[in-house]
Amino acid sequence: MSYPVGRKMSIDKSTPRNQDPNFKLLLLHPKYLPTWLGMGFIYLCKFLPYKVIIFLGTLLGYLLHGVSPHRKQIAKANMQLCFPDKSEEEIDDLVKGHFKNMGIGVFEIAIAWWSSKRTIENLKLSSKNVNIFKELDEDQGVLILIKHSTHVELDIRLMAQEIELGGMYKPQSNEVMNYLMIKARNRYVTGAINNHQAKEAIKWINNGQKFLYAADQDYGEKNSLFISFFGVDAATVTFPERLSKSGVKIVMANVSRNKERFDLEFHEISDFKEEGSVLKEVNEFYEKFILHSPENFLWTHRRFKSRPLGEESIYSEWKSRDKRRSKKRQSRE
C-alpha cells in the first residue's frame, strides 16, 4: 500500500465525526449470549472499588494462564528472545505476571468503556510532558504512538482525558464485542476509524488532528522494515516514518500502571532523514517503556512472526495453522 503523504489534503476543516455502530438483530443471535452475559458482568464491575477489580482480574489471569498453553508458549518464546539473560524460572514468573495483568486488563474495560468522566478524573494519574502539544502549531498534525499493553483500553481513556485525539481500531470478529467497543470509544475518542482506512487517518493528521496508532506489532513484511527490537530483527511498520518525512510530528506515549497509580508520559521523536532512523528510535522508546513494566506488554502477540529471508520461524508450533489460514485466503481470492 502506498500512502499519500507529503502534501496537505483539501478536505473539510471540521472535526471528523465518529460513525455510531448500528444495532443489528444479528447481535441477538443465541451464539452471542455468553458474550452479552460476560460483558454485562464486566459492566457491573464499574461500580466496584478498583482494589476489587484488581482482585477479580488476578483470579481471571491465573485461570487464563492455566487454559491457554499456546499463548503461553508464544509469550515465553518472545520473552526468551528479548531477555536472553533471564533464567527459565525468571521467564516463567514473567509469563505468570503477564497473564495476571491480562486478567486485570479485562476488568479494567469496565472503567475505560463505561465509567463517568469524574471517575476517570479521580484515578491517580501523573502526567509528564503533556505541554508538548501546546508547543506545536494549532494546525500541525501529530501521530501519537502507543504500545499494546494489557491495559490498553484504559490507556486510551486516560490519554483522551488529557488531549483530544482520534484513533484506529481493529474490527473484532465477535460482532457484539465490536459493537460495544466502538460504541464505548465514541464517547471519548474523536474520529475513530478501522485499520482498513489508513488514507482517512492520513487526511485527519494532515488536517491537524492528533491520532493514536500502535506500531509495536508485526503487520507483515509488505509495508515494514526489519528493525532491531531488543536486539532481534522485527518487522516494523513504516507508517510513522512515511508521515515523519512529510512533516508530521511523531510523539511516543506511554501509560504505566503501578498498583493503583498510573503514569502518563509523552516524548517527541527526532526528525531524521536516513531510512529506518525514525523506526529505530520508535523501537528504542518501546523497549524503554516495556522495561519499565515488562509484564504489562502484550507478549502473546507473535512479534517476530515475519523473518528475514533464510531465517526459520520462531513459532514452529503455529506453522500448520498459518498454512491453513493461507489456503483459506487464497481460496477466497
Residue ranges and their predicted role:
Residues 88, 191, 275-276:
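Flexible, glycine- and charge-enriched loops at secondary-structure boundaries
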Residues 37, 71, 151, 177, ...:
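Residue-level preference for nonpolar/small residues embedded in alpha-helices
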Residues 3-146, 179-183, 327-333:
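Membrane-anchoring hydrophobic helices of lipid-metabolizing enzymes
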Residues 4-11, 92-96, 134-138, 161, ...:
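Non-catalytic C-terminal accessory region of glycerolipid acyltransferases
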Residues 138-196, 221-228:
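Catalytic core of membrane glycerolipid acyltransferases/transacylases, capturing the structured
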Residues 47, 82, 162, 187-188, ...:
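Alpha-helical structural context
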Residues 126, 191-193, 267:
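General small-molecule cofactor/ligand-binding pocket signal
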